[in-house]
Each structure stands twice: as C-alpha cells, then as structure tokens.
Amino acid sequence: MGFVKVVKNKAYFKRYQVKFRRRREGKTDYYARKRLVIQDKNKYNTPKYRMIVRVTNRDIICQIAYARIEGDMIVCAAYAHELPKYGVKVGLTNYAAAYCTGLLLARRLLNRFGMDKIYEGQVEVTGDEYNVESIDGQPGAFTCYLDAGLARTTTGNKVFGALKGAVDGGLSIPHSTKRFPGYDSESKEFNAEVHRKHIMGQNVADYMRYLMEEDEDAYKKQFSQYIKNSVTPDMMEEMYKKAHAAIRENPVYEKKPKKEVKKKRWNRPKMSLAQKKDRVAQKKASFLRAQERAAES
C-alpha cells in the first residue's frame, strides 16, 4: 500500500479518539504495562509484583509495586539519595550506585516481610549470573518482574545494574546476562569480571586515572565532588564493599522527625457567644457610667 494522505475533514475530527494521558505525555508504555500488570486468571487476587527502576538526572528510584484499579500500590522503595548514609557520597547516578540502590531495595523488602535471614542472596560480589531459588519448608522466594519504563534497554544500561543488585539481595527476578556490561554480542559470551568492575565502580576509577594524566583541568571540573569528598580512584572498590556490607546490616528506612510549624494568625479570631455577651455587658456598663457622670456634673 502506498502513501495515503490523512484528510482532516469533519469525519476525521468527529471520530478522533485521544490517547491515554500518560501516553500523550510520553510517560507510560501501555503495550509493556499491559503485559506486566495482567495476572494469570487462576491466581485470583494474588498481586503481580513489578520492580520499577527509573533513572533521573540526580537520582535512581527503585520500587516494588503491584497494580490495582484505584492505582499502583507501592510496597517498598529505595532511592540513590539514601546512599550517603551508607558511605557512598558521590556518583549517585552511576552503575555502581544503581547496584547499591537495587540491593538496598531487596534487603529492605525482605526485612519487612521477615525473610531477610532466609534469603541472603549473593553476599560476595562476582558479577556472574545468579538466580534465587525457593527453599523447601520456607516461604517461597519473592518474585517480581523488571519494569524499565521507556528506558532504552541496551547492554550496560543502569536499569540492569539495579536489577543485579536486587537479585544479589535475594529477590527472584527472571533475567539473562545479555544486557549486563561484559556481554559480547558477537561472540555471545559473558565476561563476569567486566561486570564486577562496573559494580565496584572501577570503570569510573579508570577514567579518573586517565583524566588525571591527560587533562588535569577536565579532571578537576568533572570530578569536583570526588575531590571535595577526598575520594580517590584507589578508594572506590573499598567504598562500595563497605556500602554493600552496611546496607545488609541495616536496610531499614528511618523516618525523619516532623517539623513543628507554629501557625501565625494574621486576623483576629472569631469571638464566642459568651465573649460577645460579655463585650455588650461591658459596653452597657461603660455607657451607664458615662451617663451618671454627665448627670452629676
């Protein structure tokens, strides 16, 4: 069929149907969402959990959610801006930070359900493929599915860093190694050591060393926060190892204390009935006293 020009006449506008709001805004891929949300009909009211990963300019958001008619219900959430608490003060949007955020989400969720001692996950970071399996006589492994949204799911995307962190943390998420850094599409082989380097921030450390030698000014400009926090390339691996251990030790979210706000009143408050009656009585008494004084004089 050749090119057909759309004739925008009365019939076109009369029959025009707008797309969903979040599709118009370019926020939701409804083709993917439909498949992620719909549960098997023989599972009745069992929720189908999704691991949602979104990368913004300054943060990485990881959530476990399930869909309801009223809207999505968030079961648990973890953010990259929480990582300074665990010792990672810089590079909060790189691959290593995505891994830490995914790990934090998994440990926090399992801790909430009392399964953190049953499913420890992979404590030693190898970068190799690892899958969580249910243990006999214990609650089954928590299963969810990756929701990458509209992110381009290319090999090495940070979304898969968060996925790997969650899997190593003890969640059962179906995946393969094809999208992890270290996978070669030509030879169809996966190099786990390359992946481990990314998890430990060694790709960033190598670039820091390269810039230090080649262009000092560019290094100072690009890694100003690293310099400010005294983070050197040699410290990176140890920093992330300590962060992983700290996350496993205490993944619980601590609520910030609510600020007490003293309300200022800009107008006079309304008087009660008793106050109004008292005011009238005072005015009457004052008026009568004035009348008496006038009569005496």
Curated annotation (Swiss-Prot):
Indicate the cross-link positions, Glycyl lysine isopeptide (Lys-Gly) (interchain with G-Cter in SUMO2). Answer: 220
* Cross-link Glycyl lysine isopeptide (Lys-Gly) (interchain with G-Cter in SUMO1), where in sequence: 220
Whether Cell inner membrane counts among this entry's keywords is no
Residue numbers of N6-acetyllysine PTMs: 5, 48, 220
Tell me where in this chain the PTM Phosphothreonine is found: 232
* GO MF terms, alphabetically ordered: 5S rRNA binding; mRNA 3'-UTR binding; mRNA 5'-UTR binding; RNA binding; structural constituent of ribosome; ubiquitin ligase inhibitor activity; ubiquitin protein ligase binding
Residues found modified as Phosphoserine: 185, 272
- Pfam families from the UniProt entry: Ribosomal_L18_c (PF14204), Ribosomal_L5e (PF17144)
- Coarsely, its chief localization is cytoplasm
List N-acetylglycine occurrences by residue: 2
Q: Can the keyword Kinase be found in this entry's annotation? A: no
Described by its record, this protein's role is as follows: Component of the ribosome, a large ribonucleoprotein complex responsible for the synthesis of proteins in the cell. The small ribosomal subunit (SSU) binds messenger RNAs (mRNAs) and translates the encoded message by selecting cognate aminoacyl-transfer RNA (tRNA) molecules. The large subunit (LSU) contains the ribosomal catalytic site termed the peptidyl transferase center (PTC), which catalyzes the formation of peptide bonds, thereby polymerizing the amino acids delivered by tRNAs into a polypeptide chain.
Cited PANTHER family: LARGE RIBOSOMAL SUBUNIT PROTEIN UL18, RIBOSOMAL PROTEIN L5-RELATED
Report the family membership. Belongs to the universal ribosomal protein uL18 family.
The condition associated with this protein in its record is: Diamond-Blackfan anemia 6: A form of Diamond-Blackfan anemia, a congenital non-regenerative hypoplastic anemia that usually presents early in infancy. Diamond-Blackfan anemia is characterized by a moderate to severe macrocytic anemia, erythroblastopenia, and an increased risk of malignancy. 30 to 40% of Diamond-Blackfan anemia patients present with short stature and congenital anomalies, the most frequent being craniofacial (Pierre-Robin syndrome and cleft palate), thumb and urogenital anomalies.
Name recorded for this polypeptide: Large ribosomal subunit protein uL18
Q: What is the lineage of its organism?
A: Eukaryota, Metazoa, Chordata, Craniata, Vertebrata
